[in-house]
């Protein structure tokens, strides 16, 4: 299918500022869009932490939060008020602040971060809810939600009901502060295959609701920090394991370089684990004294997250394509995103009716994933822009019998027909893609789909953008096409039959084909009454008849008398 000539580009043009893509909005609109997204995130955040209900997928929330920060930076706005962390409802102070973790974009960033750092370990980045556990005199004295990193809610009553969390400790852990992740226990969870399952939201919901004590049995704990604990990492891990926090030791590995980090990351992505993960965390064994820990200042650890299974992408334009059969398809052009190492910059929405039902306009944020064979797929619209500037689709008068001849309204279906006849299913013109057909048609103004047969080698060579080797190849392909059998030319004319049915018919000339009745076509493989009728309509179409006479004049096999 080819893109409609008068495709409607959206109002979002993009430029680079400090390495980020920024919408070219007027100041008033920028302020409005930022305020709307900020309020939506705040509402979702409030529902998530107060009611334990996720109104949106965790990954979508994270990506939209990052998009908000990007927009705010584009306009020079303070990002401190961005609601990416829980609202501060609790007032219980953490004995040691939660620093958070810096995110590294790729292996190169990992290599750079590791340079100059020593005694490094890697752990899975368990996807759950962060908590502080305070042990005093060998007993669990308090459990505090992460909150803003300095203070949070007192979760002690709920945490006491989680069987997997030790209620008493000994030795160095008798009086200790631990930081970790409360997670949903899984059996044989393979992250690459099963995804995130909204695990973080499920854990938050269990901890927030008041009527589900039994559900807490399914929660576990992964300790990732023991502030002021043993300086020796193996000793630290050993003591945690003896106290009942065994997962930390089991899933902590010494790493010397980015290659070892990458191997661990890939292994945990594809192996069966007892929890959901969203990447890995690299940390130095040597940490500063806890009195120096501050939110956002943990430079001794960093995370390398897994690429999301689905990406939030910005719609930059809505385009319409018309296939050779006349079907109109809507395509969304996107600000490019990367999915599984694939650069995605457009996604097929489907029919005009489906597009209207989706209500997608330039400026909207949509969730895109990869379907079978790596084809981009639209999953949902996650955010709609305030401004709803939609293009008008082309008239729907196209069908399987239109646009064999070029006209102003037929440009896209005409190009689609050229692409089809050059494909391996028809004449097999190697090297003739859409761009080549467009260049030839724009230069030489084809009258119909076979006008290229009349081109001379000089005309092809004088086509803008064609190098000498390219033009010579096209000339050879066009000459070879003249030797193709009759059935190939009929396929190029888009007869509504499969190749198998056409071969079974035994027709080797236009004269034979004209003599066939509808009853004959019905008896062919995969050809019923409806398709047989379409063959008759195709054969009797005036444009098809004219094309058959033109091919006869060109001495194409099967069309002469």
UniProtKB/Swiss-Prot annotation:
Catalytic activity, reaction form: NAD(+) + (deoxyribonucleotide)n-3'-hydroxyl + 5'-phospho-(deoxyribonucleotide)m = (deoxyribonucleotide)n+m + AMP + beta-nicotinamide D-nucleotide
One Pfam family linked to the record: DNA_ligase_aden
An annotated GO BP: DNA repair
Tree of life domain: Bacteria
Active site: 125 (n6-amp-lysine intermediate)
InterPro entries cross-referenced by the UniProt entry: DNA_ligase_AS (IPR018239), DNA_ligase_B (IPR020923), DNA_ligase_CS (IPR033136), DNAligase_adenylation (IPR013839), DNAligase_N (IPR013840), NA-bd_OB-fold (IPR012340), NAD_dep_DNA_ligaseB (IPR050326), NAD_DNA_ligase_OB (IPR004150)
Coiled-coil segments on the chain, per record: none
One MF term in the entry's GO annotations: DNA ligase (NAD+) activity
Purpose: Catalyzes the formation of phosphodiester linkages between 5'-phosphoryl and 3'-hydroxyl groups in double-stranded DNA using NAD as a coenzyme and as the energy source for the reaction.
Protein family (similarity comment): Belongs to the NAD-dependent DNA ligase family. LigB subfamily.
Name this polypeptide is given: DNA ligase B
